[in-house]
Amino acid sequence: MDTLLKIVQTINMYLSDYVLIILLLGAGLYFTIRTKFVQVRCFGEGWRRFFGEFSLNGEKHKSGMSSFQALATAVAAQVGTCNIVGACGAILIGGPGAIFWMWIIAFFGMATIYAEAVLAQETRVVEPDGTVLGGPVYYIKRAFPKGFGKFLAGFFAVAIILALGFMGSMVQSNSIGEACQNAFHIPSWVMGLIVSAIAAFIFIGGVQRIASVTEKIVPIMACLYLLGGLIVLIARIRYVPETFGMIFKYAFAPQSIIGGGIGYALKTAISQGAKRGLFSNEAGMGSTPHAHALANVKSPHEQGTVAMIGVFIDTFVVLTMTALVVICTLYAGNGPLAHGAVDGISKTNMAQLAFSSVFGETLGNAFVAICLLFFAFSTIVGWNLFGRINVNYLFGKKANLAYSIIAIIFIFLGSCLSNDLVWELTDMFNQLMVLPNMIALVALSGIVAVAARKHNDEHELRK
């Protein structure tokens, strides 16, 4: 077992540090050019569509979702424990400058996720009973109609079911169990039972219940976390300018805070920012297109602009709030990490220490635990939907109940078990599913360019 663990860890290291960073950043640059900077040109349009659709009690649809429900479901999956623990890890290893590189990655990722949403809309399938299905498996088969496409789509479907539907849920429920046990002394297995029961109620309700839950939970959890972060920043407002200064300073000269030569330090800052940013906003990963395919919109371009807002919310709002709070309290003002890592502070407790510096230990730990609970549970709900669509693709609707039952078992087991191999396998399948998704995106990039150009031409005619 130890040998297998080492093999999987080695595969993950090469995938995350080299293959995926080059692939995903390259795709972001490529689609930025092909769409003529759609993330800049249509940024305002995306927000207008977001606020135009915003609702905590959205209209019920016989099939699919509203545009806002689709975005809420996507954001539910995007905004997870990585927005807290992942951001802390990037800062601890790569220094405050890692956040700058997260912003750069997210900017280009907005073009990639636009492409994913457009293709998901273009290739979605409406079944005779009105059920809407869509996602990478459908545009992979459009890109490669023969045997190769069938193989790639099948590979993607299996990878995402394992990575998100089953093992990924274990990782998220484990975070919930640990957070609540540390903050409230509730046994992790008890939280596992509670989370599993609530998840079962949602899963059995199908797509409509998932949409109804995510459109309510996402605005609440985001506002709660941002409010707590704002309180900390206001309390430490004299250090906010220094915080932004550290982000930009250590983006290009991180060696003084993380050690090593300038080349090694700069590589570490960039790789940590890129890796954590990519895995947080999921642009190019092939997960969120499942939600965007279900949106009932007039044109694929419309949902593409809304999808970009998901990346912005995840990285430029929620993840950035974590970064500002942590840097403002633990780095700025000659904080405990101002001169590098110290014993007793790790990525798993940085957020608690940061919020506790203003809220006090008890309230700070409780606040982070509650936010982690919201973030992790919403991710479980979103990921379950993505896995369900791929189960339908492979086995048909008859397998939905069995899939939900297995997912619920994994959620409970994850709350009270900690297995490094499971965590590493989750990362491996999560990264492997990027490969077929990216191949199909590039192969169908002409469709994306046409959608962006058509909107641009129509906009010019209206002037």
Language-model segments: residues:
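Extracellular/periplasmic helix-exit of transmembrane alpha-helices
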Residues: 115-128, 230-246, 254, 258-261, ...
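Transmembrane helix-loop junctions in multi-pass membrane proteins
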Residues: 2-4, 34-39, 82-87, 165-177, ...
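Alpha-helical membrane segments and immediately flanking helix-loop junctions
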Residues: 58-92, 119-122, 128-137, 141-143, ...
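Helix-loop-helix module between adjacent transmembrane segments
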Residues: 31-32, 105-130, 137, 141-174, ...
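Membrane-interface loop-to-helix entry segments
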Residues: 23-30, 34, 38-47, 156, ...
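Flexible loop linkers connecting adjacent transmembrane helices
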Residues: 37-65, 89, 95-96, 111-147, ...
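N-terminal alpha-helical transmembrane segments of multi-pass membrane transport
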Residues: 1-81, 91-98, 109, 412, ...
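Selective recognition of specific alpha-helical transmembrane segments in multi-pass small-molecule
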Residues: 108-116, 193-207, 218-238, 271, ...
